Amino acid sequence: MAFIAKSFYDLSAISLDGEKVDFNTFRGRAVLIENVASLUGTTTRDFTQLNELQCRFPRRLVVLGFPCNQFGHQENCQNEEILNSLKYVRPGGGYQPTFTLVQKCEVNGQNEHPVFAYLKDKLPYPHDDPFSLMTDPKFIIWSPVCRSDVAWNFEKFLIGPEGEPFRRYSRTFPTINIEPDIKRLLKVAI
């Protein structure tokens, strides 16, 4: 089992360009974390909506995308290829993320990223689908398997401005529909 941090602000990640992303710098802002993949059926929808949310709350929301290849091998690019895949393939059309993408990682199993170990400990299942599990066992390519595992690409975790994990959303929950919860956390009129 992975080490679980005591606080969200103790965590960090490495961006696609190799810079350390220290979560301590996010104090006072809401944070949306989503495991992403550039070759998934909902890539265009979810990446576009992540950009939209980041643009709507440019100073009060931090959006972090964590590329992961554990679900149907739908992020098979190397770190240095991911941005070009997004720009030219899917979503394509010159797409550029307005949020931070970190280096490819695992979100489940023995080698899960510490961010996901922490978030799954605090939010063990999506609030909109508490029974969500991987539906086809042939896609489970990690060990050990846990009830709190991320079930597929584009699960989302929303963290409040005080660093408290607030809510987890399933892959079927549209990213843009998180906006009312972001406003609630930021105390913005809905």
From Swiss-Prot:
One of its GO terms (molecular function) is glutathione peroxidase activity. One of its GO terms (cellular component) is cytosol. SUPFAM superfamilies: Thioredoxin-like. Its EC number is 1.11.1.9, 1.11.1.12. Keywords: Cytoplasm, Oxidoreductase, Peroxidase, Selenocysteine. The active site is at U40. GO terms for biological process: response to oxidative stress. Its main location: cytoplasm. The keyword Secreted does not apply. The keyword Cytoplasm applies. It is found in: Cytoplasm, Cytosol. It catalyses: 2 glutathione + H2O2 = glutathione disulfide + 2 H2O; a hydroperoxy polyunsaturated fatty acid + 2 glutathione = a hydroxy polyunsaturated fatty acid + glutathione disulfide + H2O; tert-butyl hydroperoxide + 2 glutathione = tert-butanol + glutathione disulfide + H2O; cumene hydroperoxide + 2 glutathione = 2-phenylpropan-2-ol + glutathione disulfide + H2O. Homotetramer. Catalyzes the reduction of hydroperoxides in a glutathione-dependent manner thus regulating cellular redox homeostasis. Can reduce small soluble hydroperoxides such as H2O2, cumene hydroperoxide and tert-butyl hydroperoxide, as well as several fatty acid-derived hydroperoxides. Cannot reduce phosphatidycholine hydroperoxide. Belongs to the glutathione peroxidase family. This is Glutathione peroxidase 2. The gene is GPX2.
